[in-house]
């Protein structure tokens, strides 16, 4: 039997994992500067965590979620998105208590799972970078979250991205809009796709996000939520957009934007990238919004919240096209070559010392001929080669060579204890 990875999964090999690490490090440092701390939740949860949060009628729950009964008969689901598990952890660990500073701000970088048709930037196991902020209903919290998404994409080197924004209003607005959609689509029910016929009775808002050809003809004339917003919802949304304008963050008011999960309330947003080398049309790489009732769904107290998630696979496709420097092999700082009796352990000691000084250093564990060692140094993209022979060891003097231009420098074994000073001499 040929052993292969499951369909919809990808091996991120060392040639690529370095660029993933760079992106995630940039994201981690970015979030830390905003005082967001990391949270790690299980890769699988009880099924109800996701069915209650995402909505029984959502495509995620109906079609895409990996769920099963474990050996103890428990109904388990693999994490299809990041927010629900974080909310569950927030409630279960009583992070809503008065001893926890609000807003409670966290970020995560996790693998997630959905049974989808694999394609470029979309796998059945994929990765999400996300943030969640609990405890503030201020429009400034929404703006902070949107601004973070905007600025993170800029820091990563993403180009040609556009912010699309909409609001779903409050609970009463959602109810009124729900009724309007039911009234509009009910006479058309027999002409809708099978999925949308089912959604009509469960959550007609989902019909607006349908990609089925039989549904698309009815969407342009469907009611728009903007016509059902009350004054408070309008004022809140105007405050948010005014702040974005003051911050110089351009946006597109998008009445068609509804998002794919049922827990959103208030402002929702997506950052879309247009790159003809990747996709025929603009594609979402970051999406989020406000969800003020999800904590209550998990039996917690009334808690406003807002957040976003980034699909890391799509992000990496964009960055490979738009910021290729992130994908360059940085190589190592030093390769220690050695020849002659008694030099092996000294090469090990030198590499060990350099690593302790935060340099990347390697030596040849196979102890091949010197010519082969130099060839290996070139293949691993070493910046410098340190050569150690029996004579050099006896005299306590080493030779260091910069491979880029051949510049050399002799140094004593003691010099290795302060290699940063040696590097400064070479650069002069």
UniProtKB/Swiss-Prot annotation:
Enzyme class at the top of the EC tree: ligase
Subcellular location: Cytoplasm
Major place of residence: cytoplasm
Domain of life where this protein originates: Bacteria
GO biological process: histidyl-tRNA aminoacylation
Chloroplast in keyword set: no
Enzyme Commission numbers on file: 6.1.1.21
InterPro entries named in the record: aa-tRNA-synth_II, aa-tRNA-synth_II/BPL/LPL, Anticodon-bd, Anticodon-bd_dom_sf, His-tRNA-ligase, HisRS-like_core, HisRS/HisZ, HisRS_anticodon
GO cellular component, one term: cytoplasm
Subunit details: Homodimer.
Record's protein name: Histidine--tRNA ligase
Gene that encodes it: hisS
């Amino acid at each position: 039997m040929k052993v292969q990875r499951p369909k919809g999964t990808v091996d991120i090999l060392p040639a690529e994992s370095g660029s993933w690490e760079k992106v995630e490090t940039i994201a981690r440092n970015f979030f830390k500067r905003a005082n967001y701390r990391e949270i790690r939740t299980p890769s699988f949860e009880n099924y109800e965590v996701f069915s209650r949060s995402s909505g029984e009628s959502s495509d995620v729950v109906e079609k895409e979620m990996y769920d099963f009964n474990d050996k103890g008969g428990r109904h388990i689901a693999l994490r299809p998105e990041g927010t629900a598990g974080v909310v569950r952890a927030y409630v279960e660990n009583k992070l809503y208590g008065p001893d926890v500073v609000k807003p409670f701000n966290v970020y995560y970088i996790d693998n997630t799972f959905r049974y989808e048709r694999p394609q470029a930037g979309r796998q059945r196991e994929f990765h999400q970078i996300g943030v969640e902020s609990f405890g503030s209903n201020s429009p400034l919290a929404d703006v902070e979250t949107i601004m973070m998404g905007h600025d993170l994409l800029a820091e990563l080197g993403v180009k040609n991205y556009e912010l699309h924004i909409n609001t779903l209003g409050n609970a009463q607005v959602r109810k009124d809009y729900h009724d309007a959609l039911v009234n509009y689509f009910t006479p058309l029910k027999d002409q809708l796709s099978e999925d949308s016929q089912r959604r009509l009775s469960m959550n007609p808002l989902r019909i607006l996000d349908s990609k089925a050809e039989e549904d698309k003809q009815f969407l342009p004339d469907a009611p728009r939520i903007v016509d059902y917003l009350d004054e408070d919802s309008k004022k809140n949304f105007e405050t948010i957009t005014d702040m974005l304008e003051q911050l110089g963050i351009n946006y597109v008011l998008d009445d068609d934007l509804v998002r794919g999960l049922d827990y959103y309330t208030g402002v929702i947003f997506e950052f879309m990238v247009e790159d003809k080398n990747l996709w025929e049309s603009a594609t979402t790489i970051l999406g989020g919004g406000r969800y003020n009732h999800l904590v209550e769904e998990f039996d917690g107290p009334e808690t406003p919240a807002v957040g976003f998630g980034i699909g890391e696979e799509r992000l990496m496709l964009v960055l490979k096209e738009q910021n290729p420097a992130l994908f360059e092999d940085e190589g190592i700082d030093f390769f220690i070559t050695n020849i002659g009796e008694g030099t092996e352990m000294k090469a090990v000691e030198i590499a060990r010392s350099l690593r302790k000084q935060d340099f990347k250093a390697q030596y040849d564990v196979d102890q091949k001929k010197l010519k082969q060692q130099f060839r290996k140094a070139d293949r691993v993209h070493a910046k410098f080669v340190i050569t150690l022979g029996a004579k050099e060891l006896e005299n306590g003097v080493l030779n260091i060579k910069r491979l880029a231009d051949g510049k050399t420098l002799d140094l004593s074994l003691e010099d290795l204890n302060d290699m940063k000073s040696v590097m400064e001499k070479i650069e002069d």
